């Protein structure tokens, strides 16, 4: 049976956790894009910027479900640094992997159990998008490591 209010549910907390994570990812990817551009990786810079915009859209979709007020959450987020473009791609792929294999499937399952099927579907779909982001980053990592990026 579908619920009408998120207030006091784990799904409400999960949405805020995911919103914060997507918002941070957007900023990290923007920072990583600047570093890639500085290192001469124009195409990778554009991919980071494109992905940052997609993360913004994910954050927007999640934020629209929230009902306002104050909510206390406990979550861990990467307190990483801006490294080389290769290091940044590796960090990004790691984060996307965590989201698509653990966080979003778990959050979708909880939303479904709590009676929020529409939210569960959105969470599942964002997880699919994160899987694509991970595969894209891993392909770029391979191309840099194999010296085939510009070939």
What are these regions (language model features)?
Residues 1-151:
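Non-heme di-metal
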């Amino acid at each position: 049976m579908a619920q009408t209010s998120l207030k006091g549910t784990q799904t409400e907390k999960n949405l805020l956790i995911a919103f914060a994570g997507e918002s941070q990812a957007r900023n990290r990817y923007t920072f990583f894009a600047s570093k890639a551009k500085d290192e001469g990786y124009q195409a990778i810079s554009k991919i980071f910027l494109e992905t940052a915009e997609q993360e913004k859209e994910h954050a927007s979709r999640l934020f629209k479900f929230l009902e306002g007020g104050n909510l206390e959450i406990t979550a861990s987020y990467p307190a990483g640094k801006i490294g080389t473009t290769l290091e940044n791609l590796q960090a990004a792929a790691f984060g996307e992997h965590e989201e698509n294999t653990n966080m979003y499937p778990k959050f979708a399952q909880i939303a479904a159990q709590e009676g929020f099927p529409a939210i569960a579907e959105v969470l599942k779909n964002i997880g699919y998008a994160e899987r694509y982001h991970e595969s894209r980053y891993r392909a770029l990592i391979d191309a840099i490591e194999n010296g085939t990026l510009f070939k």
